[in-house]
Amino acid sequence: MSHQILLLLAMLTLGLAISQRREQVPCRTVNKEALCHGLGLLQVPSVLSLDIQALYLSGNQLQSILVSPLGFYTALRHLDLSDNQISFLQAGVFQALPYLEHLNLAHNRLATGMALNSGGLGRLPLLVSLDLSGNSLHGNLVERLLGETPRLRTLSLAENSLTRLARHTFWGMPAVEQLDLHSNVLMDIEDGAFEALPHLTHLNLSRNSLTCISDFSLQQLQVLDLSCNSIEAFQTAPEPQAQFQLAWLDLRENKLLHFPDLAVFPRLIYLNVSNNLIQLPAGLPRGSEDLHAPSEGWSASPLSNPSRNASTHPLSQLLNLDLSYNEIELVPASFLEHLTSLRFLNLSRNCLRSFEARQVDSLPCLVLLDLSHNVLEALELGTKVLGSLQTLLLQDNALQELPPYTFASLASLQRLNLQGNQVSPCGGPAEPGPPGCVDFSGIPTLHVLNMAGNSMGMLRAGSFLHTPLTELDLSTNPGLDVATGALVGLEASLEVLELQGNGLTVLRVDLPCFLRLKRLNLAENQLSHLPAWTRAVSLEVLDLRNNSFSLLPGNAMGGLETSLRRLYLQGNPLSCCGNGWLAAQLHQGRVDVDATQDLICRFGSQEELSLSLVRPEDCEKGGLKNVNLILLLSFTLVSAIVLTTLATICFLRRQKLSQQYKA
């Protein structure tokens, strides 16, 4: 009897499908995938090919999911129903899809309608991934909705209204590896809530309301995101033989007062504790009785045994450590000595007044060190330290007088940012410079140097000799005197030169010799002329804004025609006539000149015009008018002289005749 009923249903289904083939199918089918997203559909289409394996219905207006017509597509493996208005799931609707592996129900209304009264999702034996994010699920609604899914590996319950996780919340899904719970309001996680997930490796609990992590015992976990909570303490209470696999831990934007307990995580390679309230103590606790004393600044500190072998130290494998945006005033040497594998260290935006790395082979693998936005007054680096350091960020501190070879001792340094300090460079061997200056010559690895805003008064000759810089920023040093030969040695390497806002009236730099220079910024100075580029160079961008240029003669700019792509000229008293080279660039479009409609030039002594509107004949007419005026003035002057001479002669003759008559 049952076979006859199934046969009848199959015949009815086939007949219905055939009869509806004449209707226009709104979806596009490619390789057994039906693409129906964003079509404004009110129900699941019933006229699709019966052998489709993927059905994408996101971004429609579906409210109910019924066995018919969804049950027609028994070969479905991937079903996307996200971003609809679904509030009703007919009982057994997904059981009609025996091969279903991926189900996306994100951003619907499963918590507001009858979806939960139908028995939830039911048993889905082959389901691998399930997305229920953004459905306002709360309380025990999740438990009622979730069914038995023995093969489920990825589950998302993000962006819901969960406040608590119970021990039995995740029963029936023992294979889950990735669990996303971000953006809920979780305040409590019952002990053993994750015991039903023995294979869990990735757990996202970010953007919740958790205040404390205690008795952490998820040994198999590899990635844990606890960012954007209100966590004040992170502690573990592992079993004696526990072997934790945690490699990635994110605790940023919490309320941690102390460095977290990491003693049980020997495989940790990434740690982010930025945006907390962390302070590091001046030294390590001395007695074993103080090893777990938060009042000393250590929270079950992993650093409390300095005699431990570095290779077995819990932080010895750490590659990335972010401590930015905290309240750290001092980094003790004992904190750094075991970070033997660390490659990236961010200590920016703290309260550091000094930083020391004196111990030989300290931080041997560090590639990037960010100490920017502190109040650093002292930087002491010993010899043979930071041997792999390539990038050092020191901008916006209070550095003033440093040992002269502070940076020359860094064997691999490539990028150095000193913007916003008070550092003065020494000169070359012939001009060593004043006390407290820093030597930037003879650093063969350094390529990028930023010394903007350092209140430098003098840049001496040979300041960067034998240092192959490609980028040099000397901007915002008002009153800077660039001595002749200050940039000598950079002619073959320099590609970017920034000299903006220095008040320069004369530029004693032979720019045409810098054959690889691609970007030159001379804005906001008082320059009125440039050296002549008579041969082809590589300059692509030239910024001359807010200077005193009136003319850019072709004999000086001709060498730039093959390379120059962009020219900035606003804020200069340009002359409308005599700028034939510039006018040619505007009209021919060979160079992109900024704001050509607003680029104003002076025509004569008073009249101002848009440079793009000036034509050569305008200047010729202006020239003829000037010639005519000069001729008229000359004729008038000559006439006046002749008349004056004649009048004088007549007067003298009359006077002579008068004297003769009297005689």
From Swiss-Prot:
Present in medial edge epithelial cells at 14.5 dpc (at protein level). One of its GO terms (molecular function) is transforming growth factor beta binding. The chain crosses the membrane at residues 629-649. Residues 301-311 have a biased composition (Polar residues). It comes from the Eukaryota. Residues 18-628 are extracellular. It holds the Pfam family LRR_8. Gene3D superfamilies: Ribonuclease Inhibitor (3.80.10.10). One of its GO terms (biological process) is negative regulation of cytokine production. Residues 22-49 form the LRRNT domain. LRR repeats lie at residues 49-72, 73-96, 98-123, 125-148, 149-172, 174-196, 197-220, 222-241, 243-267, 269-287, 315-338, 340-362, 363-386, 387-409, 411-433, 443-466, 468-489, 491-514, 515-539, 541-559, 561-584. Residues 572-621 form the LRRCT domain. Disruption phenotype: Lethality within 24 hours after birth. Mice display defective palatogenesis without apparent abnormalities in other major organs. Glycans are attached at N204, N272, N305, N309, N346, N546. Residues 1-17 form the signal peptide. It is found in: Cell membrane; Cell surface. Residues 650-663 are cytoplasmic. It is a single-pass type I membrane protein. Residues 291-311 are annotated as: Disordered. Belongs to the LRRC32/LRRC33 family. Interacts with TGFB1; associates via disulfide bonds with the Latency-associated peptide chain (LAP) regulatory chain of TGFB1, leading to regulate activation of TGF-beta-1. Interacts with TGFB2. Interacts with TGFB3; associates via disulfide bonds with the Latency-associated peptide chain (LAP) regulatory chain of TGFB3, leading to regulate activation of TGF-beta-3. Interacts with LAPTM4B; decreases TGFB1 production in regulatory T-cells. PANTHER family: LEUCINE RICH REPEAT FAMILY PROTEIN (PTHR45617), LP04042P (PTHR45617:SF181). Key regulator of transforming growth factor beta (TGFB1, TGFB2 and TGFB3) that controls TGF-beta activation by maintaining it in a latent state during storage in extracellular space. Associates specifically via disulfide bonds with the Latency-associated peptide (LAP), which is the regulatory chain of TGF-beta, and regulates integrin-dependent activation of TGF-beta. Able to outcompete LTBP1 for binding to LAP regulatory chain of TGF-beta. Controls activation of TGF-beta-1 (TGFB1) on the surface of activated regulatory T-cells (Tregs). This is Transforming growth factor beta activator LRRC32. The gene is Lrrc32.
